[in-house]
Amino acid sequence: MEDSAELQRFYEQGYSLPGPEAERFSRWRSLGAIGKAEHVIELCRRARIEPSSTLDVGCGDGALLSELARRGFGGRLVGLEITDAAVAIARQRKGIDAVERYDGQSVPAPDASYELGVLSHVLEHVPDPPQLLEEVARACQAVVIEVPLEANLSARRHTKREHAAEVGHLHSLDRADARSIVREAGLTVRAELADPLPREVQLFFAQGARARIKANARWATRATLHGMLPDLARRLFTVHYAALCTPSPSE
């Protein structure tokens, strides 16, 4: 996927699934949005930022914005999305002030017009992550990014690589890669965190008692290891990395 038109066609299919399948993935995205919203709020707390306006770039069906609205966080909530189908869904959600379609490259807003920007699980999907992050940072005074750290032993398995390709991941990142993207965009990390998938997300696709027991054990093992030895955990399995970034000081 080399351009925004190709990206748009790819993701349009993901938001145009038949009824039962669409409902299932809608629940999946809403479940994932809980942890993502917690990350945004916690990073803003650490950086002492209380945004009165928030722009979610690549907002999908608006699940994250909806969760922020439910928690009363972020002030005026606006989303930008590349697909018509997702925009239509997001506009139906309560608490979101506006959702617009954009070209995947240029943010249609003046400089520093939003106090907070969000790129949650977006940068791994685009051809030039630093370029998009720099553009979002132009329009937003601070930006929260979140990416999966997939440069690990588990993600090297053939089935994992196939899944990453199926969902449109163009980059397999580690923490150093993510921080490098931030630097290339002219930004500095002010606060960061990482954690494995939440228990509820691990259990979502587990069918049957045995599968749920196995998924629960996997979650417990990973959460414990990440809590004790986070560097080792990141080398073994995927964790989600989030950082709040602001423009680097001029020299």
Where are these regions (language model features)?
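Conserved N-terminal segment of class I S-adenosyl-L-methionine
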Residues: 1-110, 116, 133, 193-194, ...
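S-adenosyl-L-methionine-dependent methyltransferase catalytic module, highlighting the catalytic core
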Residues: 7-31, 93, 127-248
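A short beta-strand submotif of the Rossmann-like class I SAM-dependent methyltransferase core
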Residues: 119-122
